[in-house]
Amino acid sequence: MNSIIVNKLIALQERFNVLEKLLSKPNAIDDKKHFCTLAKEHARLSEIVVCFERWLDIKQEIINTKKLLEDVDMHDIAQDELKTFYLNRNNIEKNLKILLLPTDSNDKLGCFIELRAGTGGKEAAIFTGELFRMYVRYSEVRRWKMEIINATYGECGGYKEIIAKIPYRGAYSLLKFESGGHRVQRIPHTESQGRIHTSTCTIAVIPEIPDIELPSIDPHDLRIDTFRSSGAGGQHVNTTDSAIRITHVPSGLVVECQDERSQHKNKAKALSVLGSRLHAIEMKRRQQEVSCTRRNLLGTGDRSDRIRTYNFQQGRITDHRISFTSYKLNEIMNGELDLLIQPIIHQHQSDQLNKLLELE
Protein backbone atom coordinates (compact mmCIF):
# COMPACT_ATOMS: atom_id res chain seq x y z
CA MET A 1 0.00 0.00 0.00
CA ASN A 2 1.18 3.51 -0.80
CA SER A 3 3.39 4.92 1.98
CA ILE A 4 1.43 8.19 1.95
CA ILE A 5 -1.77 6.29 2.69
CA VAL A 6 -0.07 4.25 5.44
CA ASN A 7 1.25 7.42 7.09
CA LYS A 8 -2.21 8.98 6.97
CA LEU A 9 -3.69 5.86 8.56
CA ILE A 10 -1.09 5.94 11.33
CA ALA A 11 -1.98 9.58 12.02
CA LEU A 12 -5.69 8.70 12.17
CA GLN A 13 -4.93 5.81 14.52
CA GLU A 14 -3.05 8.17 16.85
CA ARG A 15 -5.93 10.66 16.72
CA PHE A 16 -8.37 7.85 17.54
CA ASN A 17 -6.33 6.91 20.63
CA VAL A 18 -6.32 10.55 21.77
CA LEU A 19 -10.10 10.72 21.36
CA GLU A 20 -10.57 7.57 23.44
CA LYS A 21 -8.61 9.15 26.29
CA LEU A 22 -10.55 12.42 26.05
CA LEU A 23 -13.92 10.67 25.99
CA SER A 24 -13.05 8.45 28.96
CA LYS A 25 -12.28 11.39 31.27
CA PRO A 26 -14.75 11.74 34.18
CA ASN A 27 -15.59 15.34 33.25
CA ALA A 28 -15.86 14.69 29.50
CA ILE A 29 -19.65 15.05 29.54
CA ASP A 30 -19.55 18.48 31.23
CA ASP A 31 -19.44 20.23 27.87
CA LYS A 32 -22.15 18.29 26.02
CA LYS A 33 -21.65 20.03 22.69
CA HIS A 34 -17.89 19.37 22.70
CA PHE A 35 -18.50 15.79 23.87
CA CYS A 36 -20.89 15.14 20.96
CA THR A 37 -18.35 16.56 18.49
CA LEU A 38 -15.62 14.27 19.82
CA ALA A 39 -17.98 11.28 19.90
CA LYS A 40 -18.93 11.78 16.24
CA GLU A 41 -15.28 11.99 15.23
CA HIS A 42 -14.53 8.87 17.29
CA ALA A 43 -17.36 6.96 15.58
CA ARG A 44 -16.17 8.09 12.14
CA LEU A 45 -12.60 6.94 12.78
CA SER A 46 -13.55 3.68 14.49
CA GLU A 47 -14.20 1.69 11.31
CA ILE A 48 -11.02 3.01 9.69
CA VAL A 49 -8.86 2.10 12.69
CA VAL A 50 -10.34 -1.40 13.05
CA CYS A 51 -9.74 -2.04 9.35
CA PHE A 52 -6.18 -0.66 9.55
CA GLU A 53 -5.36 -2.86 12.55
CA ARG A 54 -6.55 -5.90 10.60
CA TRP A 55 -4.23 -4.84 7.78
CA LEU A 56 -1.30 -4.56 10.20
CA ASP A 57 -2.06 -8.02 11.61
CA ILE A 58 -2.11 -9.58 8.14
CA LYS A 59 1.09 -7.75 7.23
CA GLN A 60 2.81 -9.38 10.22
CA GLU A 61 1.29 -12.78 9.35
CA ILE A 62 2.79 -12.49 5.85
CA ILE A 63 6.23 -11.71 7.31
CA ASN A 64 6.03 -14.70 9.67
CA THR A 65 4.73 -17.07 7.00
CA LYS A 66 7.45 -16.11 4.52
CA LYS A 67 10.00 -17.39 7.02
CA LEU A 68 8.36 -20.83 6.84
CA LEU A 69 9.10 -21.06 3.11
CA GLU A 70 12.67 -21.99 4.02
CA ASP A 71 11.38 -25.07 5.83
CA VAL A 72 11.03 -27.95 3.33
CA ASP A 73 8.26 -29.62 5.33
CA MET A 74 6.24 -26.39 5.68
CA HIS A 75 6.90 -24.89 2.24
CA ASP A 76 3.67 -25.98 0.50
CA ILE A 77 1.47 -25.12 3.48
CA ALA A 78 3.13 -21.72 3.78
CA GLN A 79 2.54 -20.98 0.09
CA ASP A 80 -1.18 -21.75 0.42
CA GLU A 81 -1.45 -19.56 3.50
CA LEU A 82 0.34 -16.71 1.75
CA LYS A 83 -2.16 -16.79 -1.12
CA THR A 84 -4.99 -16.39 1.40
CA PHE A 85 -3.19 -13.62 3.27
CA TYR A 86 -2.45 -11.70 0.05
CA LEU A 87 -6.09 -11.96 -1.03
CA ASN A 88 -7.33 -10.73 2.36
CA ARG A 89 -4.77 -7.94 2.38
CA ASN A 90 -5.86 -6.72 -1.06
CA ASN A 91 -9.53 -6.69 -0.02
CA ILE A 92 -8.73 -4.76 3.16
CA GLU A 93 -6.65 -2.24 1.20
CA LYS A 94 -9.58 -1.61 -1.14
CA ASN A 95 -11.87 -1.01 1.84
CA LEU A 96 -9.34 1.29 3.52
CA LYS A 97 -8.99 3.44 0.41
CA ILE A 98 -12.77 3.83 0.20
CA LEU A 99 -13.01 4.65 3.93
CA LEU A 100 -10.40 7.40 3.52
CA LEU A 101 -12.34 9.18 0.78
CA PRO A 102 -14.21 12.39 1.64
CA THR A 103 -17.84 11.60 2.42
CA ASP A 104 -20.85 13.36 0.98
CA SER A 105 -23.23 14.01 3.87
CA ASN A 106 -26.15 13.80 1.44
CA ASP A 107 -25.33 10.28 0.19
CA LYS A 108 -27.61 8.63 2.76
CA LEU A 109 -30.62 10.68 1.65
CA GLY A 110 -33.41 10.16 -0.82
CA CYS A 111 -33.65 12.49 -3.80
CA PHE A 112 -35.73 14.49 -6.22
CA ILE A 113 -35.11 13.88 -9.91
CA GLU A 114 -36.13 16.54 -12.44
CA LEU A 115 -36.22 15.89 -16.19
CA ARG A 116 -36.79 18.64 -18.76
CA ALA A 117 -37.00 18.30 -22.51
CA GLY A 118 -34.35 20.39 -24.28
CA THR A 119 -33.69 20.98 -27.96
CA GLY A 120 -35.58 18.77 -30.37
CA GLY A 121 -39.22 19.72 -29.87
CA LYS A 122 -41.65 16.79 -29.79
CA GLU A 123 -38.85 14.23 -30.11
CA ALA A 124 -37.13 15.72 -27.03
CA ALA A 125 -40.32 15.24 -25.01
CA ILE A 126 -40.57 11.62 -26.17
CA PHE A 127 -36.92 11.04 -25.22
CA THR A 128 -37.56 12.62 -21.80
CA GLY A 129 -40.41 10.17 -21.30
CA GLU A 130 -38.15 7.24 -22.18
CA LEU A 131 -35.49 8.40 -19.73
CA PHE A 132 -38.09 8.74 -17.00
CA ARG A 133 -39.28 5.21 -17.76
CA MET A 134 -35.63 4.08 -17.40
CA TYR A 135 -35.50 5.58 -13.89
CA VAL A 136 -38.86 4.02 -13.03
CA ARG A 137 -37.53 0.60 -14.10
CA TYR A 138 -34.33 1.18 -12.11
CA SER A 139 -36.41 2.10 -9.06
CA GLU A 140 -38.35 -1.13 -9.45
CA VAL A 141 -35.09 -3.11 -9.61
CA ARG A 142 -34.01 -1.38 -6.38
CA ARG A 143 -37.49 -1.83 -4.89
CA TRP A 144 -37.91 1.90 -4.52
CA LYS A 145 -41.28 3.59 -4.83
CA MET A 146 -41.22 6.73 -6.97
CA GLU A 147 -43.64 9.58 -6.26
CA ILE A 148 -44.49 11.97 -9.11
CA ILE A 149 -44.55 15.59 -7.92
CA ASN A 150 -45.45 17.33 -11.17
CA ALA A 151 -45.65 16.47 -14.86
CA THR A 152 -46.18 18.48 -18.04
CA TYR A 153 -46.98 16.18 -20.94
CA GLY A 154 -45.63 16.43 -24.48
CA GLU A 155 -47.94 16.87 -27.47
CA CYS A 156 -46.99 13.50 -28.98
CA GLY A 157 -46.21 11.65 -25.77
CA GLY A 158 -43.47 11.82 -23.20
CA TYR A 159 -42.93 14.86 -21.00
CA LYS A 160 -41.90 18.45 -21.43
CA GLU A 161 -41.04 18.34 -17.75
CA ILE A 162 -41.46 15.86 -14.91
CA ILE A 163 -40.36 15.95 -11.27
CA ALA A 164 -40.40 12.88 -9.03
CA LYS A 165 -39.30 12.00 -5.52
CA ILE A 166 -37.49 8.82 -4.47
CA PRO A 167 -37.69 8.89 -0.65
CA TYR A 168 -35.32 5.99 -0.02
CA ARG A 169 -32.06 5.96 1.93
CA GLY A 170 -29.06 6.09 -0.39
CA ALA A 171 -31.00 6.92 -3.57
CA TYR A 172 -29.11 10.21 -3.95
CA SER A 173 -25.70 8.49 -3.78
CA LEU A 174 -26.58 6.31 -6.77
CA LEU A 175 -28.41 8.84 -8.92
CA LYS A 176 -26.51 12.09 -8.25
CA PHE A 177 -24.21 11.56 -11.23
CA GLU A 178 -27.23 11.54 -13.56
CA SER A 179 -27.35 15.35 -13.37
CA GLY A 180 -26.47 16.97 -16.67
CA GLY A 181 -27.33 16.96 -20.36
CA HIS A 182 -28.47 13.72 -22.00
CA ARG A 183 -28.42 13.55 -25.83
CA VAL A 184 -30.18 11.09 -28.12
CA GLN A 185 -29.29 10.33 -31.75
CA ARG A 186 -31.86 8.39 -33.81
CA ILE A 187 -34.38 8.51 -36.62
CA PRO A 188 -37.73 9.71 -35.19
CA HIS A 189 -40.90 7.86 -36.14
CA THR A 190 -42.14 11.08 -37.75
CA GLU A 191 -39.04 11.37 -39.99
CA SER A 192 -40.01 10.37 -43.55
CA GLN A 193 -36.56 10.76 -45.16
CA GLY A 194 -34.63 8.60 -42.70
CA ARG A 195 -32.49 11.39 -41.30
CA ILE A 196 -30.91 11.05 -37.87
CA HIS A 197 -32.05 13.74 -35.44
CA THR A 198 -30.41 14.90 -32.21
CA SER A 199 -32.54 15.79 -29.19
CA THR A 200 -31.66 16.56 -25.60
CA CYS A 201 -32.99 16.26 -22.08
CA THR A 202 -31.54 17.98 -19.03
CA ILE A 203 -31.64 16.22 -15.66
CA ALA A 204 -31.07 17.54 -12.16
CA VAL A 205 -30.86 15.25 -9.12
CA ILE A 206 -31.00 16.99 -5.75
CA PRO A 207 -31.01 15.44 -2.26
CA GLU A 208 -34.25 15.25 -0.31
CA ILE A 209 -33.24 17.29 2.72
CA PRO A 210 -35.03 16.43 6.00
CA ASP A 211 -37.50 19.15 7.02
CA ILE A 212 -35.48 19.97 10.14
CA GLU A 213 -32.44 20.82 7.97
CA LEU A 214 -34.24 22.77 5.25
CA PRO A 215 -33.47 26.49 5.05
CA SER A 216 -36.11 28.70 6.61
CA ILE A 217 -38.21 30.44 3.98
CA ASP A 218 -39.85 33.77 4.69
CA PRO A 219 -43.54 33.45 3.70
CA HIS A 220 -43.37 37.05 2.43
CA ASP A 221 -40.84 35.87 -0.19
CA LEU A 222 -43.38 33.47 -1.71
CA ARG A 223 -46.04 34.02 -4.34
CA ILE A 224 -48.55 31.17 -4.30
CA ASP A 225 -50.95 30.59 -7.20
CA THR A 226 -53.62 27.91 -7.53
CA PHE A 227 -54.98 26.36 -10.72
CA ARG A 228 -56.77 23.25 -11.92
CA SER A 229 -54.78 20.07 -12.44
CA SER A 230 -54.36 19.00 -16.06
CA GLY A 231 -53.47 15.68 -17.66
CA ALA A 232 -52.11 14.52 -21.00
CA GLY A 233 -53.22 16.74 -23.86
CA GLY A 234 -54.02 19.58 -21.49
CA GLN A 235 -57.46 18.36 -20.39
CA HIS A 236 -58.45 19.28 -16.85
CA VAL A 237 -58.68 16.26 -14.55
CA ASN A 238 -59.95 18.10 -11.48
CA THR A 239 -62.82 20.53 -11.05
CA THR A 240 -61.20 22.38 -8.12
CA ASP A 241 -58.12 24.60 -7.98
CA SER A 242 -56.02 21.99 -6.17
CA ALA A 243 -52.78 22.45 -8.14
CA ILE A 244 -50.18 24.75 -6.63
CA ARG A 245 -47.52 27.00 -8.15
CA ILE A 246 -45.04 28.55 -5.71
CA THR A 247 -42.63 31.27 -6.80
CA HIS A 248 -39.69 32.16 -4.57
CA VAL A 249 -39.39 35.83 -5.50
CA PRO A 250 -35.76 36.49 -4.37
CA SER A 251 -34.32 33.58 -6.38
CA GLY A 252 -36.92 33.35 -9.13
CA LEU A 253 -37.35 29.61 -8.51
CA VAL A 254 -40.77 28.23 -9.48
CA VAL A 255 -42.21 24.90 -8.31
CA GLU A 256 -45.51 23.38 -9.36
CA CYS A 257 -47.32 20.39 -7.89
CA GLN A 258 -50.61 18.93 -9.10
CA ASP A 259 -50.18 15.26 -8.23
CA GLU A 260 -52.52 15.25 -5.22
CA ARG A 261 -56.23 16.08 -5.13
CA SER A 262 -55.66 18.04 -1.93
CA GLN A 263 -54.38 21.60 -2.26
CA HIS A 264 -52.69 21.33 1.15
CA LYS A 265 -50.78 18.17 0.15
CA ASN A 266 -49.69 19.76 -3.13
CA LYS A 267 -48.49 22.84 -1.24
CA ALA A 268 -46.50 20.71 1.22
CA LYS A 269 -44.83 18.79 -1.62
CA ALA A 270 -44.03 21.96 -3.53
CA LEU A 271 -42.48 23.58 -0.43
CA SER A 272 -40.37 20.46 0.12
CA VAL A 273 -39.03 20.62 -3.45
CA LEU A 274 -38.41 24.37 -3.16
CA GLY A 275 -36.54 23.95 0.13
CA SER A 276 -34.35 21.21 -1.32
CA ARG A 277 -33.57 23.33 -4.40
CA LEU A 278 -32.59 26.32 -2.26
CA HIS A 279 -30.44 24.05 -0.08
CA ALA A 280 -28.73 22.61 -3.19
CA ILE A 281 -28.00 26.13 -4.48
CA GLU A 282 -26.47 27.15 -1.14
CA MET A 283 -24.36 23.98 -0.92
CA LYS A 284 -23.09 24.54 -4.46
CA ARG A 285 -22.18 28.14 -3.60
CA ARG A 286 -20.16 26.96 -0.58
CA GLN A 287 -18.40 24.28 -2.62
CA GLN A 288 -17.45 26.87 -5.22
CA GLU A 289 -15.95 29.09 -2.55
CA VAL A 290 -13.84 26.22 -1.23
CA SER A 291 -12.77 24.59 -4.49
CA CYS A 292 -12.89 27.65 -6.82
CA THR A 293 -15.20 25.59 -9.04
CA ARG A 294 -12.46 23.16 -9.98
CA ARG A 295 -13.95 20.78 -12.51
CA ASN A 296 -13.10 17.11 -12.16
CA LEU A 297 -13.73 14.32 -14.64
CA LEU A 298 -17.31 13.93 -13.44
CA GLY A 299 -18.24 17.47 -14.38
CA THR A 300 -20.05 19.98 -12.21
CA GLY A 301 -23.53 18.52 -12.56
CA ASP A 302 -24.72 21.64 -14.37
CA ARG A 303 -27.63 20.96 -16.66
CA SER A 304 -25.68 22.43 -19.58
CA ASP A 305 -23.03 19.70 -19.29
CA ARG A 306 -23.45 17.02 -21.96
CA ILE A 307 -22.71 13.91 -19.96
CA ARG A 308 -24.16 11.10 -22.05
CA THR A 309 -25.17 10.17 -25.60
CA TYR A 310 -27.75 7.51 -26.50
CA ASN A 311 -27.32 6.22 -30.08
CA PHE A 312 -30.29 3.96 -30.84
CA GLN A 313 -29.19 3.17 -34.40
CA GLN A 314 -26.05 1.45 -33.08
CA GLY A 315 -27.48 0.30 -29.75
CA ARG A 316 -24.69 2.29 -28.10
CA ILE A 317 -24.58 4.49 -25.01
CA THR A 318 -21.54 6.61 -24.10
CA ASP A 319 -20.82 8.44 -20.86
CA HIS A 320 -18.45 11.24 -21.87
CA ARG A 321 -17.19 11.98 -18.35
CA ILE A 322 -15.33 8.69 -18.07
CA SER A 323 -15.14 7.79 -21.79
CA PHE A 324 -17.20 4.68 -21.11
CA THR A 325 -19.16 3.02 -23.92
CA SER A 326 -21.62 0.15 -23.67
CA TYR A 327 -23.59 -1.62 -26.39
CA LYS A 328 -26.25 -2.73 -23.89
CA LEU A 329 -28.48 0.26 -24.57
CA ASN A 330 -31.72 -1.75 -24.44
CA GLU A 331 -30.81 -3.35 -21.11
CA ILE A 332 -29.90 0.03 -19.60
CA MET A 333 -33.11 1.67 -20.86
CA ASN A 334 -35.02 -1.19 -19.22
CA GLY A 335 -33.61 -0.46 -15.78
CA GLU A 336 -30.15 -2.05 -15.68
CA LEU A 337 -28.68 1.36 -14.95
CA ASP A 338 -26.01 -0.03 -12.64
CA LEU A 339 -24.12 -0.97 -15.82
CA LEU A 340 -23.39 2.77 -16.06
CA ILE A 341 -23.65 3.94 -12.46
CA GLN A 342 -21.07 1.57 -10.95
CA PRO A 343 -18.22 2.44 -13.40
CA ILE A 344 -18.89 6.14 -12.73
CA ILE A 345 -18.79 5.64 -8.95
CA HIS A 346 -15.57 3.61 -9.17
CA GLN A 347 -13.91 6.26 -11.34
CA HIS A 348 -15.09 8.99 -8.98
CA GLN A 349 -13.59 7.14 -6.00
CA SER A 350 -10.32 6.69 -7.88
CA ASP A 351 -10.26 10.40 -8.73
CA GLN A 352 -10.93 11.34 -5.10
CA LEU A 353 -8.12 9.07 -3.91
CA ASN A 354 -5.68 10.63 -6.38
CA LYS A 355 -6.62 14.09 -5.13
CA LEU A 356 -6.14 12.91 -1.55
CA LEU A 357 -2.62 11.72 -2.38
CA GLU A 358 -1.85 15.01 -4.14
CA LEU A 359 -2.75 16.95 -1.01
CA GLU A 360 -0.39 14.96 1.22
Swiss-Prot record:
<feature type="modified residue" description="N5-methylglutamine">
    <location>
        <position position="235"/>
    </location>
</feature>
<dbReference type="GO" id="GO:0016149">
    <property type="term" value="F:translation release factor activity, codon specific"/>
</dbReference>
<comment type="function">
    <text>Peptide chain release factor 1 directs the termination of translation in response to the peptide chain termination codons UAG and UAA.</text>
</comment>
<keyword id="KW-0648">Protein biosynthesis</keyword>
<dbReference type="InterPro" id="IPR000352">
    <property type="entry name" value="Pep_chain_release_fac_I"/>
</dbReference>
<dbReference type="Pfam" id="PF03462">
    <property type="entry name" value="PCRF"/>
</dbReference>
<dbReference type="Pfam" id="PF00472">
    <property type="entry name" value="RF-1"/>
</dbReference>
<dbReference type="InterPro" id="IPR004373">
    <property type="entry name" value="RF-1"/>
</dbReference>
<dbReference type="InterPro" id="IPR050057">
    <property type="entry name" value="Prokaryotic/Mito_RF"/>
</dbReference>
<dbReference type="InterPro" id="IPR005139">
    <property type="entry name" value="PCRF"/>
</dbReference>
<comment type="similarity">
    <text>Belongs to the prokaryotic/mitochondrial release factor family.</text>
</comment>
<keyword id="KW-0963">Cytoplasm</keyword>
<dbReference type="GO" id="GO:0005737">
    <property type="term" value="C:cytoplasm"/>
</dbReference>
<dbReference type="InterPro" id="IPR045853">
    <property type="entry name" value="Pep_chain_release_fac_I_sf"/>
</dbReference>
<protein>
    <recommendedName>
        <fullName>Peptide chain release factor 1</fullName>
    </recommendedName>
</protein>
<keyword id="KW-0488">Methylation</keyword>
